[in-house]
Amino acid sequence: MTRPPDLADSPPPEAQTPTRARPRYRPLPTADMPRILWADDEIDLLKPHVLFLEAKGYSVETVTNGADAVDRVADDRFDVVFLDEQMPGLGGLDALEQIKERRPETPVVMITKSEEEHLMEDAIGRKIADYLIKPVHPKQILLTCKRLLDGDRIRGEQVQQDYLQAFGQLSARLGGPLAHDEWIDVYKQLVRFDLDLEGGDESVRQILDDQYKGANEAFARFIEERYPEWITAARDSEKPGESRPMLSHDIIGESVMPLLGDVGGTPERPVVFFLIDCLRYDQWLLFERTLQQHFEVETDWHYSILPTATPYSRNAIFGGLLPMDLARRFPDRFTADVRDDDEPSLNAHEDAFLRDLLDRRHRKDIRMRYEKISTASDGAAFADRVTDLLQVDLSAVVVNFVDILAHSRSDSRVLREIAPDVPAYRGLSTTWFEHSWLSDAFRQLAEHDCTVVITSDHGAVRSLNATKVIGDRETSTSLRYKHGRNLKVDGREAIFVKEPEDYGLPRAGINENYIFATEDRYFVYPTNYHKYQERYRDSFLHGGVSLEEVLLPVATLRPTR
């Protein structure tokens, strides 16, 4: 046995090579260092890689065979396992399977000399975290470690940095005049940062929340100033463009009818129009991630008409008319005296409105069908026969679940606990969609030659601040908008509509006014003010003026098959 050299065996200082590099400092492992297990029968040849990782702050343990790797993983916890595919005895793939049985959460990186595709597919099928081809460079190993262990942190820090850099630009835009299409760009940026910063630094999120609040304040002023001009232009038959955006009553004419072919022609393929009630843009972006697996998605935008409530915006969509014109054309089907936006009868004639719109604006021989789905059992039955929609030229499908979720959260303590804030509410609706009959229906439609159009009638805003309103007993009951006689409200906290016709709205009588809550406010009467303030606080509501309620996507989907 060779005795290790001691100090007495060392050559005198003058005999040592003066230019010899000192050994690199090798930090001692600490409890907070990421731990790596590396299994390779030629691990001695990879010593420079190990030293490089240790110098970068990783604790690396090495073994020379798959069996030892499995034993070490069973005995201890590692943050990453590097596994050579070709080792004597227990091979890499077999070791991978046993490691995953013991520690399914541990990321395993397969390293191999083989470039055969079936080996890659086999390893990927067994849920490896990465696949590297020898020879590997130390920095390649480091990059893999950073991606697996620090990826979320690095991405989060980068998003925060990007937002803080964009903050000044956004603030400058919000401080100046914006056109209707520029407001859409600002809103898209805010929503993207909202999604990307989810779970990040709370101080940065607070900055974003404050900027969101400022944006909604400016947006309300913009709507109050410009909306009557848009209504005038629309009633003068001016098409959406620079002077006005696409509004609710334009959607069928602008985004659906062109897909049905020219007047007198035949549609190239069936069109299925989905209206998902109360769907916000941030929710849509998460739904879209699932749909992009099956469809090419092209997104346009529309502004919901006011009030952003189902009896107005959804009837306008299917009728192709502003509410005041709808009331004149269908006095027995659309009343100007709307008192409760939750009353199903207020939207009982959407199929008749759509048929009338097609007859007026396109042609009478369009074959259409209409369905409204409000329960899970109705949805399951719909998914079972969804391909029947392809037997006609145009199908219109109203999906009420997201709206029901928003209203149910207001009344359910359990739902409030499950979805206590906007990100959780978003996540809850996304989880539903991914596992729903609706997602199944879209997958089936993606297998056929058809075009799908998806939009919403309005969004919803998390309402946290009450504002007092005074009205008589005949005043409508909605929390984000009201209409009645001689309404009184603080003009700094709502939009007051003295002349309903200026907003394209029907007038039920003399001195009839409308008011729309702005930002995150909701209306409460002075009587029992604190009781109802507390009762309705932190509800997702609609009917008023906010970016979340008004700005809505119109998506056209074509199967990728």
Residue map of PLM features:
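Short amphipathic alpha-helix used as the core "switch/output" element in two-component signaling
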Residues: 71, 93-104
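Two-component/phosphorelay signaling modules centered on CheY-like receiver
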Residues: 43-61
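Feature captures the catalytic ectodomains and active-site-proximal regions of enzymes
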Residues: 3-17, 86, 121, 151-561
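Acidic catalytic/metal-coordinating carboxylates
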Residues: 64-68, 91-94
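Active-site beta3 strand of CheY-like receiver
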Residues: 77-82
